Design a protein with these regions (language model features):
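Conserved pre-ATP/AMP-binding loop-to-beta segment of ANL
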Residues: 25-26, 149-167, 174, 197-203
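Conserved AMP-binding/adenylate-forming core of the ANL superfamily
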Residues: 26-73, 77-81, 98-103
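Conserved AMP-binding A3 loop
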Residues: 38-43, 163-187
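Conserved structural elements of the adenylate-forming
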Residues: 45-53, 159, 178-199, 204-207, ...
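AMP-binding/adenylate-forming catalytic core of the ANL superfamily
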Residues: 97, 114, 362, 367-368, ...
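Conserved AMP-binding/adenylation subdomain of ANL enzymes
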Residues: 186-203, 213-251, 266-267
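Gly/Ser/Thr-rich phosphate-binding loop
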Residues: 250-255, 264-327, 341
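Conserved ATP/PPi-binding loop(s) of AMP-dependent carboxylate-activating enzymes
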Residues: 334-337, 348-379, 415-417
Length: 515
């Protein structure tokens, strides 16, 4: 088993861990900015084996879900690997989802065991109030979770066995449980490693939660494939980001657009040696505003590679090539290791530069949604393409441009308006850190447009500035009627702005008002 750009990885995640422990036992694979001790491949292998045997001794059936309700850190990472190593299905619980969604995940996954740490104990207890199940709670903060009995045998594992059950954010309904096999999880890490030409000498900075597909596949599984390493942080910190990049000799990082915007508007800058060492920063989970990307690169001198991925595709679908390859600002790039196409509303396949739904096929695509046949059928075409729910087009060079989510499309007076157009116009203002446009019901037009922004501290900007900016860039029809100023916009676990929730947290919703 070797990392090759032209062939997806064979075997299981366990096989790849075994390989590294045998061939590079003393190489550091994971470090932790919170002070947890470093892990070498051999140390990880030893610890994971002991925890996996502990799980087998609990008489858990092969393939059963075991949930993790823990903060980023060494214990969570070890337990993630151990669940897979033991032949079970890891179910990371989204700590930002709220009690009802967590309770649903616990019930729906049928997990009988949940790992928790002290900082997340209250979160878990609140979630358990939303479910009738009674899983065994294993608190890693005060439990010895390892077994050394050599007579305990681990389950045999194959590439097509279930590995991961991860729940979608559920912003438009009940969260769905996405099933990935060992094979598709490895392929998710492989597509990232191929696109970014990751080497064993590369070291990633992970500031995203491991219960999110980006944090998990991009900065945990991709280094497993490439033989590189990753530094895992408890969470994103504007004040610590560049310091951590320098301290740990980071060569690349994976973030989301809101983090890029916060860094851009922050006071700290990377040192010259850090700038030279950083090959690239990776942006995913939401479209990156053109002005934000350009301003970031101009200030910090670090190229940003915009990408696109889903929970259903073990993260990456598309990526821009690394410099000196051609990057197209405003596009998440081209396919690496999988295929993409555009499906038109009538079901026909793509015509270049024509907007339709983005579809993907490849080894990193999920198996199905757990116990949700109807949703699985709607998501896959008859010939096996996964419909992403994103609208976009492919240009003459094969680059995909995303115009928005199908469910977020604003339809005003019968005209389709992409909220991203409005977001990008607002991000052109120097004081805007976060921006999102959204639809409001309207008796005359069906829907009208409002937007929410977060501004830099001490900004004196007023609503008229933003309305006039949108008028000049978009025309009055596409411009928002109202701007909401907020301290924070609602976001999911990766930091992606949850546009649909803006209806609930702003005062703009008034179905009876006529405009």
């Amino acid at each position: 088993m070797n990392f090759t750009p032209n062939f997806k990885p064979d075997g299981t995640i366990c096989d790849w861990l075994n390989k590294h422990a045998e061939l590079s036992p003393d190489k550091i694979c994971y470090q932790f900015s919170n002070g947890d001790s470093d892990l070498t491949w051999s140390a990880l292998f030893d610890k994971v084996n002991k925890i996996a045997k502990y799980l087998v001794k609990l008489n858990i059936n092969k393939g059963d879900s075991i949930a993790i309700c823990m903060s980023n850190g060494r214990p969570a990472l070890q337990i993630f690997y151990a669940i897979l190593y033991g032949g079970f299905r890891v179910t990371p619980l989204n700590l930002a989802a709220g009690p009802a969604a967590l309770g649903h995940a616990i019930s729906h996954s049928k997990c009988k065991h949940i790992f928790v740490d002290d900082p997340q104990l209250e979160t878990l207890n609140n979630a358990l109030l939303e479910t009738d199940t009674n899983p065994k709670i294993i608190n890693v903060s005060n439990s010895l979770i390892e077994e050394t009995d050599p007579s305990i045998k681990l389950h045999d594992i194959s590439p097509n066995d279930h590995a991961l059950l991860m729940y979608t954010s559920g912003t438009t309904g009940v969260p769905k449980g996405v099933i990935h096999t060992h094979s598709s999880l490895l392929a998710g890490g492989w597509t990232t490693a191929v696109a970014h030409n990751l080497q064993s000498s590369d070291r990633a900075l992970c500031v995203l939660p491991l219960y999110h597909i980006n944090g998990l596949c991009v900065t945990v599984i991709a280094p497993l494939i490439s033989g590189g390493s990753s530094v895992i942080c408890p969470k994103f910190s504007n004040s610590n980001f560049w310091t951590d990049c320098e301290k740990f000799k980071i060569t690349w990082f994976s973030v989301v657009p809101t983090i890029i915007s916060h860094l851009l508007h922050g006071k700290n800058d990377p040192s010259e040696i850090t700038k030279k060492r950083l090959r690239f920063g990776r942006s995913a989970s939401a479209p990156l505003a053109v002005d934000t990307q350009s301003s970031f690169e101009k200030r910090f001198g670090v190229p940003i590679i915009e990408t696109m991925g889903l929970t259903e595709t073990a993260a990456q679908i598309l990526s821009n090539p690394l410099p000196p390859g051609q990057r197209k600002i405003g596009s998440p790039g081209i396919a690496f290791g999988n295929k993409v196409k555009i499906v038109l509303p009538n079901g026909d396949d793509q015509i270049n530069n024509t907007i339709g739904e983005i579809a993907v096929k490849g080894p990193n695509v999920m198996l199905e949604y757990l116990d949700n046949y109807e949703a699985s059928q709607k998501t896959f075409t008859n010939d096996g393409w996964l419909l992403t729910g994103d609208l976009g087009y492919i240009d003459n060079d094969g680059y995909v441009f995303v115009s928005g989510r199908l469910k977020e499309l604003i339809i005003k007076g019968g005209e389709n308006i992409s909220p991203r157009e409005i977001d990008d116009a607002l991000y052109a203002h120097k004081d805007v850190i976060e921006a999102a446009a959204f639809a409001i019901p309207c008796d005359i037009y069906g829907q009208r447009i409002e937007a929410a922004v977060k501004l830099t501290k001490n900004s004196k900007a007023i609503e008229a500035e933003f309305l006039n900016l949108c008028y000049s860039k978009l025309g009055k029809f596409k411009a928002p009627d109202k701007i909401h100023f907020m301290d924070e916009l609602p976001k999911g676990p990766s930091g992606k702005i949850q546009r649909i929730k803006l209806l609930d947290v702003t005062d703009g919703l008034n179905k009876n008002k006529v405009y």
